[in-house]
Amino acid sequence: KRDRELKDSAELEEPFRFRDIFEIVRIKGFWYIAILCVLFYSAVFPFLKYAPDLMFNKFGISEKLSGIIPALLPFGTILLTPFFGNLYDRRGKGATIMLVGSFMIVAVHLLFAVPAFTNWLLALVLIITLGIAFSLVPSAMWPSVPKIIPENKLGTAFALIFWIQNWG
């Protein structure tokens, strides 16, 4: 019975066509999401790599604790991303959620760059804020793709976004 179901579902699938790629890249919203994805992840992941040095050298946090504070960021996203995803499901406003998260990331990076800000408590608040932003953006970014891309091209669209992200 299962073999018959698999055969039936395989017959319903459309084959990949290069024309799908050209149709997807003509959608303006696709480029907004792809560029946001590149900029977002390139603002967060490199920061996490160098954040322990920043905590130690700028904020005077002990070497032992300087790695713990930035490490809290991914754990916070585990808790917050489903919450913000649910908010997006109930209220919509995906563009607003992505914009708020993006502006928060920019603000946090700018505040980290201010030489006069050296208080360890400020560093903790900024990391928490970055964690909130790190949850906001993907909770609305990834579910926005099916809203702008036809269902039969979703796999190709997600693959293109990851491909563009790897180039970025």
Role assignments for model-derived ranges:
Residues 94-144:
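C-terminal transmembrane helical hairpin of 12-TM major facilitator-type secondary transporters
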Residues 2-34:
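Juxtamembrane intracellular "pre-TM" segments in multi-pass secondary transporters
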Residues 52, 56, 88, 145-150:
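Helix-terminus/helix-capping segments at the ends of transmembrane helices and short amphipathic helices
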Residues 151-168:
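A late C-terminal transmembrane helix in Major Facilitator Superfamily
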Residues 27-78, 138, 142:
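Extracytoplasmic gate region of multi-pass secondary transporters
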Residues 80-93:
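Helix-to-loop junctions at the C-terminal end of transmembrane segments
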